[in-house]
């Protein structure tokens, strides 16, 4: 048989495997540097028992960069960890790693070695009487697929959640499966408008994960943030204080504790924690972004305290904080060019000091980006609409972008903000007797989108009467 025929047979077998090469991970080329950086941070600074998968993901990223020899090194590390941490179920736990080995060797043209790893997968499938030669359905592989998807960004979260749910069906008390599920559900919360029931469920899965993983401080700080979201800040702060006394996963604890304290209004404490975290992870886009948000929060605090007219020392402090915030947001973008909200935050900071041209430039960069998450698209249209309404003095453009955001039907917190902003603008126009027919029609649309059909009809009827008064022919 020719080498070409061998290659085709091997390729037909490879596509049946369950591993990073067949999971259709959505990773854009500009995202790879930041993804690799976050993987290395996790390897170095996150104290976890669940670290085999991260070496597999690193191997896949190395392959995407054309570094197949480095990919093999990462896969060997994963193999060693399996023998060390999962010796009693090494076969099952090795399926993904072996699949990745086979793919990397195939891409290197080393077909005999690729076949060796295919044989390992096939033998394990036979051992467990699996009906497929190369595809094993088991909770452990579902879990690893979930971790890979979760690490690759928001556009993969729904699929990650499904994977962890599938894993939990097979083993509902497994600590790792519960941890992955809780983290993914927590991250998805920001994309969705949750009902009271769903919010309670999100809180429940985090508490369950903490119970099953009592030594995992990372999941504890996420629970703290969730409690803060739900108005239970005092209870959340207890978890934060406990986590800060631990030496485990300090870089991660510091960054999430900082987020907690910034949202609480304790911005100085948040900045102190962020600076400590940056000592160990200086290339973290997340940390630089959080620092920018802190500096901007301090600037807004001073403006509010001076009735938005700071003078003297306050003016100097505001100017200094604005420059610090701009510097941090620009650093964020340099480290992660696909950090969409960093462009928005940078634009809004420029708008605060009247640099509208620069603000417009950065808003346009955010609007032009290829964005997969509907909630994020809504959020950017919301912020740009606000910019046009309050800084650009263009109600037309503001309305256009509020409506563009609302055309995206995803139910989310951002959609609620768009509805509220459009409603306030329409009511203000009516109060000022400006474009009343159009504004009343917009109120009708808002009621319709809220499901308030009778109120919507009343608004539309009123708009028709007003239009008829203005133009009897109509």
From Swiss-Prot:
Family in the record: Belongs to the IFIT family.
SMART domains, per database record: TPR (SM00028)
Native source species: Homo sapiens (Human)
GO MF: RNA binding
GO cellular component: cytosol
Key words, A-Z: Repeat, TPR repeat
Job description of the protein: IFIT1B is likely non-functional, lacking the critical antiviral role of IFIT1. Unlike IFIT1, which is essential in the innate immune response as part of an interferon-dependent multiprotein complex, IFIT1B does not prevent the translation of viral RNAs that lack host-specific 2'-O-methylation at their 5' cap. Consequently, it probably cannot inhibit their translation by competing with the host translation machinery.
Name of the protein: Protein IFIT1 homolog B
TPR repeats: 52-85, 95-128, 141-174, 182-216, 218-250, 251-284, 305-339, 340-373, 378-412, 437-470
GO biological process: defense response to virus
Gene3D superfamilies: Tetratricopeptide repeat domain
Record-linked InterPro entries: TPR-like_helical_dom_sf, TPR_rpt
